[in-house]
Curated annotation (Swiss-Prot):
Enzyme kind, highest EC tier: ligase
Cofactors named for this entry: Mg(2+)
Molecular function GO labels: acetate-CoA ligase activity; AMP binding; ATP binding; metal ion binding
Organism in which the protein naturally occurs: Brucella anthropi (strain ATCC 49188 / DSM 6882 / CCUG 24695 / JCM 21032 / LMG 3331 / NBRC 15819 / NCTC 12168 / Alc 37) (Ochrobactrum anthropi)
Task performed by this protein: Catalyzes the conversion of acetate into acetyl-CoA (AcCoA), an essential intermediate at the junction of anabolic and catabolic pathways. AcsA undergoes a two-step reaction. In the first half reaction, AcsA combines acetate with ATP to form acetyl-adenylate (AcAMP) intermediate. In the second half reaction, it can then transfer the acetyl group from AcAMP to the sulfhydryl group of CoA, forming the product AcCoA.
Residues given in the record as Mg(2+) binding sites: 537, 539, 542
Transmembrane segments: none
Chain positions recorded as ATP binding sites: 387-389, 411-416, 500, 515, 526
Protein name: Acetyl-coenzyme A synthetase
Its EC number(s): 6.2.1.1
Positions with a binding annotation for CoA: 189-192, 311, 335, 523, 586
Length: 651
């Protein structure tokens, strides 16, 4: 745990929306009188019919979560129409293509026309309120148009990340019984084509065998690549939008009408369809976007996520657009054409707020500072981190090298299930500690419990629960409320269990230690894998590390470390470096954390969103690599063969 403290920067203090006194006052009100607090902030969005009820939630029994339940609104209206009078000609979306020479700016007025036309296409082909529409698109403006067009007519969108396999896509089509799919001929990532239409055709065949029939496929022409065509089923996007009216009235939606389903991996079985609804979700996404990122009118805001993940839903599309912001959508990858791409985009579009994942930060740190320092980055005012705990070494590099020590970092903790950020610093209010998500956002009541469910106070390690609802919370798992209760409310009765381990320090700051299934029990001691990974990465030779447990005859679990070295770091003597790293970890954490196995690897198995697939690493560490399951979602499946070949635990 980093002992360093970075006080709020003087510049941030002067200009931010929330200072520490305001944070403490608002937070107190939000937890002592949530009805009054959320009634006030619920009015940040426009309502066709104002709500009179605010909070109606119960984490016990059948678990029921309702916010603003008698209010009527529309998400698309809030993200577009209400801005037209005052900012119709302001840029809503900056699109930066995979190719660094291609970009596009879309104003709010243009966004309105594009969304209305697509909404009319959906209606023309029989899509109605409540129908599920699957969106399988790359990071192109049409992905945002598709989400907003669904919201406009009351259809429920299910966005499937364009890196997912046909099998994964089919599973998601079948689960929500979607009959309309929006895709592209191909996607482009790092200069390489991705066969989206072909994948869609395969997925539709798989779904048909499970008696779910897709009637229409609307295809965006992104590359002009050759695609197969099903007459009567397949439609070209450009032809369809040209054939309809450019205006479409937004459908009045009850606050608790579904907005979207987004599938997230369960620790067991098939993916879970997380369901978010209309009113509370938008209030929470827009409020967190404004205060966490200290968004001011005129800021250029860039979240590097993909719309296929919840971060893209809440912090590329819905939160920023509800706030009338200019949001940047990036089609490419951080290392194409080279490792300086992020910072070139920052300079090119004068980005003020930059939000990315620790995995990207660590990869770019491993490539060397010169890719960063050759850019100016003078417009950057705020940096953000999302997706997993950020190790202090990567935090320091991000702060010192990328941010030139003048941009606060908001290290945000949240989940697909939470709809928006739950624990985070606020740039003008929170002193920072590298690696800590710091304090709860307004209305969030974290609690740490031990394995028996007893509440533990003070500076302790425990299981992170949230004991009361907030407007952005998921309402259920689509079609499976029983599984929803079992997954989130049965482990600790009456509490939402996050599945994450957490440490609270003497200052009341929260440190996420990783998924509870990523917590090792070494000779009866709890150790978070994130902590050991952080120790390894603090060594000058190490770019990235992943740690898993494996069965150990004496200690119960042993510590197995996968280590990727810095670019250009050649290992003369593997055994000597293993000893050095082992000593380094002992020094950083203590003898209890001594690694049992260290395997050097050119890369780690990651999904295309940058998440490390720990399930695969655990299987290899256990020498059980015969049943690795679906590896089709990996960015580079070839990494797995190297890991198996060089495993340290061969029986």
């Amino acid at each position: 745990m980093s002992e360093k403290l970075y006080p709020v920067l003087a510049e941030a203090k002067r200009n931010t929306l929330i200072d520490n006194a305001t944070y403490l006052e608002w937070y107190q009100e939000s937890v002592s009188d949530p009805d009054s607090f959320w009634a006030k902030h619920g009015r940040r969005i426009d309502w066709f019919k104002p709500f009179t009820k605010v909070k109606n939630t119960d984490f016990n029994g059948d678990v029921s979560i309702k916010w603003y339940e008698d209010g009527v609104t529309n998400v698309s209206y809030n993200c577009i129409d209400r801005h037209l009078k005052s900012r119709g000609d302001q840029v809503a979306i900056i699109w930066e293509g995979d190719n660094p020479y291609i970009d596009k700016k879309i104003t709010y007025r243009e966004l309105h026309e594009n969304v209305c036309r697509l909404a009319n296409v959906l209606k023309k082909h029989g899509v109605k309120k409540g129908d599920r529409v699957t969106i399988y698109l790359p990071m192109i403006p049409e992905a945002a148009y598709a989400m907003l067009a669904c919201a406009r007519i009351g259809a429920v969108h299910s966005v499937v990340f364009a890196g997912f396999s046909p099998e994964a896509l089919a599973g998601r089509i079948v689960d929500c019984e979607s009959t309309f799919v929006i895709t592209a001929d191909e996607g482009v990532r790092g200069g390489k084509p991705v066969p989206l239409k072909e994948n869609t055709d395969t997925a539709i065949d798989i779904a048909a065998k499970q008696y779910v029939m897709v009637n229409k496929v609307l295809t965006v022409r992104r590359t002009g690549g050759k695609v197969s065509w099903g007459p009567g089923r397949d439609l070209w996007y450009h032809q369809e939008v040209a054939s309809v009216e450019p205006t479409c009235d937004p459908e009045p939606m009850n606050a608790e009408d579904p907005l979207f389903i987004l599938y997230t991996s369960g620790s067991t079985g098939k993916p879970k369809g997380v369901l978010h609804t209309t009113g509370g979700y938008l209030v929470y996404a827009s409020m967190t976007h404004q205060y966490v990122f200290d968004y001011h009118d005129g800021d250029i805001y860039w979240c590097t996520a993909d719309v296929g993940w919840v971060t893209g839903h809440s912090y590329i599309v819905y939160g920023p657009l509800a706030n009338g912001a200019t949001t940047l959508m990036f089609e490419g990858v951080p290392n194409f054409p080279d490792q300086g791409r992020f910072w070139e985009v920052v300079d090119k579009h004068h980005v003020n707020i930059f939000y990315t994942a620790p995995t990207a930060i660590r990869a770019l740190m491993g490539a060397g500072d010169e890719f960063v320092t050759r850019s100016s980055r003078s417009t950057l005012r705020l940096l953000g981190s999302v997706g997993e705990p950020i190790n202090p070494e990567a935090w320091e590099w991000y702060y010192n090298v990328v941010g030139d020590q003048r941009s606060p970092i908001v290290d945000t903790w949240w989940q697909t299930e939470t709809g928006g950020i739950l624990i985070t610093p606020l740039p003008g209010a929170t002193d920072l500690k590298p690696g800590s998500a710091t304090r709860p956002f307004f209305g969030i009541k974290p609690e740490l419990v031990d394995n028996e469910g007893a509440v533990i106070e003070g500076a302790v390690d425990g299981n992170l629960c949230i004991i009361d609802s907030w407007p952005g919370q998921m309402r259920t798992l689509y079609g499976d409320h029983k599984r929803f209760i079992e997954a989130y409310f049965s482990t600790y009765k009456g509490k939402y269990f996050t599945g994450d381990g957490c440490r609270r320090d003497e200052d009341g700051y929260y440190w996420i230690t990783g998924r509870v299934d990523d917590v090792l029990n070494i000779s009866g001691h709890r150790l978070g894998t994130a902590e050991i990974e952080s120790a390894l990465v603090s060594h000058h030779s190490v770019s990235e590390a992943a740690v898993v447990g494996y069965p150990h005859p004496i200690k119960g679990q042993g510590i197995y470390c996968y280590v990727t070295l810095m670019t250009g770091e050649a290992v003369q003597d593997e055994d000597a470096l293993r000893k050095e790293l082992t000593q380094h970890v002992r020094k950083e954490i203590g003898p209890i954390a001594t690694p049992d196995k260290i395997q050097f690897s050119p890369g780690l198995p990651k999904t295309r969103s940058g998440k490390i697939m720990r399930r695969i690493l655990r299987k290899i560490a256990e020498d059980e690599f015969g049943a690795l399951g679906d590896t089709s979602t990996l960015a580079d499946p070839g990494v797995v063969d190297d890991l198996i070949e060089n495993r340290q635990n061969k029986k």
